[in-house]
């Protein structure tokens, strides 16, 4: 028994990683046949069930245009789970899980389909969902308004505050990025969503915030006395936040062209990482306190010299992992005159006492040297008074590198004496890796986030204020690029971006860290 919920016979009592268990509920997926649902969302729900973190009566509903029966849907979910789940497939768990699965056939404008969805949820309520429904919109943003309007028209949404009502239960909605394509569209989207659901019932998914290492930024900073006194402009020279991918755009040309790297990942993932890295200690880990501190940082972000504070690139043909790969313009459906960037680097500052004078460099790109996401806090150089000039100017510059993916952990770089009779100094690394230090396996990001939605715990989900502040930071760049028709510079696939990105740091007598 946990918090008054029914005991779950499928829960492994030895699993101590997440002790919170969702109460009676049902989860409805719009866009259930898409890649994200098939590869990430459905396996994550199964993994939660497999770990005993969902109730036996849990309901899972797919909504889509395919002419499927409930059994067809179950077969699709099983195939997805067997191919992509993190935890082993167990027949006893599956038999329990599939009993709560239903499929509703219909288009997003189909009133009859939404009535069928309503009756399906009523049936699941009688089975044990108790009126608690979460709607996951894994669909293009242009379809949000239509789906939300239908949910409201058919009595499936609620404007009541998101508290558990013993009679009617709760209603929540989950939306995936992009949250608009600029500040104006983000405000329009927020007004549409919050006209149907109250703000605290809206969960904007940024899967990066569900990663163990991202949450560990808070633990590392605020539970260790050794780091926080140094976490300011007196000691920190600059901060680099990198999200590098080794793949191209693949089959996403229709989505990616016209969006680009800055809108795709800097506006959300990287600015959220910046906020967590730079924020002040919150009063508590409650959502309102965390969000308040993140919003203060985003509000303080400044662009000091816009024409010299960015670099844009498009990948050209080259070699990746020893294989020849195509360039951006060789991909299907990319127009020859496209100015969409596949690489973007930005320089910003934060106008507050802690970070005054410390630049933050953000970069994201495709077809780079390797897949890696990291936050590198680079400290000011120590005095050369005792040890003389260093041959390499970067030697002696301490760093704390937080690795978000793929090998989650942290590296501290510091100087040490080389063994021998000479006083020779060399940089060395001290590593912490989740896989080496803990026997528990980290939950997949979507596991944590879906569980938080069902529990109604929003600390890891950005509110509309954070989304709008992020667009306020990016919009001046996007407008400048459009007004001046900036053409991204080609860079070879497998490299670390265009020459202009390196020149941006060289102007500041700095260099990008090689991840």
Model-found features: residue ranges?
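Secretory/organelle targeting and membrane-embedding segments
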Residues: 1-175, 179-515
């Amino acid at each position: 028994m946990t918090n008054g919920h029914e005991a779950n016979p499928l829960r492994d009592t030895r699993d101590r990683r997440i002790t919170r268990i969702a109460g009676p509920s049902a989860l409805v997926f719009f866009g259930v046949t898409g890649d994200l649902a098939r590869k990430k969302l459905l396996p994550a729900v199964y993994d939660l069930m497999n770990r005993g973190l969902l109730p036996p009566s849990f309901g899972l509903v797919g909504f889509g245009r395919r002419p499927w029966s409930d059994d067809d849907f179950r077969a699709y979910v099983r195939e997805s789970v067997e191919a992509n789940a993190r935890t082993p497939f167990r027949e006893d768990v599956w038999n329990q899980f599939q009993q709560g699965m239903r499929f509703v056939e219909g288009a997003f404008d189909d009133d009859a389909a939404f009535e069928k969805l309503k009756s399906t949820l009523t049936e699941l309520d009688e089975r044990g969902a108790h009126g608690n429904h979460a709607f996951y919109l894994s669909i293009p943003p242009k379809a949000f308004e239509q789906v939300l309007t239908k949910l409201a028209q058919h009595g499936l949404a609620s404007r009541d505050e998101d508290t558990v009502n013993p009679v009617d239960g709760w209603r929540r909605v989950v939306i995936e990025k992009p949250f608009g394509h600029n500040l104006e569209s983000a405000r329009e989207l927020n007004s549409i969503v919050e006209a149907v659901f109250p703000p605290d019932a809206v969960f904007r998914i940024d899967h990066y915030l569900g990663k163990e290492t991202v949450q560990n930024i808070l633990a590392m900073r605020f539970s260790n006395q050794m780091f926080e006194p140094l976490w300011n402009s007196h000691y920190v020279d600059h901060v680099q936040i990198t999200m590098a991918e080794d793949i191209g755009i693949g089959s996403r040309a229709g989505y990616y062209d016209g969006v680009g790297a800055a809108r795709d990942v800097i506006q959300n993932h990287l600015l959220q990482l910046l906020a967590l890295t730079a924020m002040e200690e919150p009063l508590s880990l409650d959502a309102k306190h965390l969000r308040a501190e993140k919003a203060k940082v985003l509000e303080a972000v400044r662009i000091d010299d816009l024409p010299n504070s960015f670099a844009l690139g498009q990948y050209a043909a080259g070699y990746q992992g020893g294989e020849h790969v195509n360039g951006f313009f060789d991909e299907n459906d990319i127009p020859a005159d496209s100015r969409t960037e596949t690489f973007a680097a930005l320089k910003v500052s934060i106008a507050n006492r802690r970070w005054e004078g410390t630049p933050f460099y953000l970069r994201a790109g495709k077809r780079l040297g390797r897949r890696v996401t990291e936050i590198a806090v680079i400290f000011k150089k120590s005095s050369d008074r005792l040890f003389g000039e260093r041959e390499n100017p970067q030697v002696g510059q301490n760093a704390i590198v937080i690795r978000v993916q793929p090998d989650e952990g942290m590296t501290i770089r510091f100087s040490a004496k080389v063994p021998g009779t000479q006083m020779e100094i060399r940089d060395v690394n001290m590593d912490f890796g989740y896989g080496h230090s803990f026997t528990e396996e980290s939950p997949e990001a979507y596991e944590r986030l879906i569980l938080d939605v069902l529990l109604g715990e929003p600390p890891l989900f950005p509110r509309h204020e954070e989304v709008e502040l992020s667009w306020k930071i990016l919009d001046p760049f996007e407008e400048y690029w459009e007004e001046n028709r900036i053409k991204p510079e080609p860079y070879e696939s497998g490299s670390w971006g265009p020459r202009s990105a390196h020149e941006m740091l060289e102007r500041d007598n700095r260099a990008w860290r090689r991840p």
